[in-house]
């Protein structure tokens, strides 16, 4: 992985009681040792693979103002990180879920793009076996489950300040207002809505195939084609490019997909991030509620699975063997 660290700072927030978060600040930056680079590379990999929300700085953002000064050389990175950690502590203290943790600020370059990554990481306890086959306690940073993370694409921010996607952050776990306090700390508002873009794409694809008067099998083949392209982009960490997708769909209609989408006013960006959960709807139907969970391939609708909208009834012909076995045992009085 071609990742180069410019500056990296680490501080700590310790929760002493329900009201107070103690601030522990380093007096120097971390050295970019091999271990440190490996840790940042892992954090970059994990973060890049997760679904993120997109944002942009408000005009009043204190973090943006101090970051701009730091980028101009008017403040060093350590001082910037120490002041920002203090503001993060003040913001976190407003919320009852504040647990503290290690606060990481890392300015790094990956594939010619400069980033500033800000994360609050937890230290977890575990066990390890040493060379004598003894079991000893150990601690590790829980990078895989970090949910208080934001990343600023410094290159995009400085070259295209009107962009709505240079800042990304994780939404956090359900029931925790992680996004709320982090947006307040960053002084940012939500920008590009990736889910809305993906939903718009799905609607455009359905309308495109309908206008081309394709039969059911042909429509499903197009959906599978779109899903395959989008999933490849997702796996590669690339965005969905409308022009590239349109070339994939050449021959479906006399009108190109990009022309169709522009003419019909779907307001799709030229490129946007893929959203895994939304894209699954191209090939599957899924839903849950009231103790019922259903998931099936879209091609089965109208063949083995039938929906009557008048009665809201789903009829399934031919159940999976393991489900059928459970039903037979239960109805025959078995366990």
Swiss-Prot record:
Coiled coil: none annotated. It holds the Pfam family NA37. InterPro entries: Nucleoid_associated_NdpA. It is found in: Cytoplasm, Nucleoid. One of its GO terms (cellular component) is bacterial nucleoid. Belongs to the YejK family. This is Nucleoid-associated protein YejK. The gene is yejK.
